[in-house]
Amino acid sequence: MISIKVLFFGEACQLVGKREEAIDFPEETDYEEIRKTILENYPALQKIEKVMMLAVDQEYANPGDRFELVRFTEIAVIPPLSGG
């Protein structure tokens, strides 16, 4: 396991009550495991679960993506984007 900084933006930040948190993940993991771990740690995010996006090291992540996490990896939880 490795402790990774998870950043929360917009509504995700409001739901969890903080901008960032260190969460433990397996060093070799995938999109689904990252999503599951974050939702287990922050059940309030279930409110936006179907529309939230994840980014790993500033690149959007997609279902099926695999990752080898290292000490300085950052994961971002991004709520639905809106605007015009």
Curated annotation (Swiss-Prot):
Organism: Caenorhabditis elegans
One GO-annotated biological process of the protein: Mo-molybdopterin cofactor biosynthetic process
Protein name, UniProt field: Molybdopterin synthase sulfur carrier subunit
Pathway: Cofactor biosynthesis; molybdopterin biosynthesis
Signal peptide: none
Keywords: Cytoplasm, Molybdenum cofactor biosynthesis, Nucleotide-binding, Phosphoprotein
Subunit structure: Heterotetramer; composed of 2 small (MOCS2A) and 2 large (MOCS2B) subunits.
Main location: cytoplasm
Post-translational modification: C-terminal thiocarboxylation occurs in 2 steps, it is first acyl-adenylated (-COAMP) via the hesA/moeB/thiF part of MOCS3, then thiocarboxylated (-COSH) via the rhodanese domain of MOCS3.
Lineage: Eukaryota, Metazoa, Ecdysozoa, Nematoda, Chromadorea
Record carries keyword Nucleotidyltransferase: no
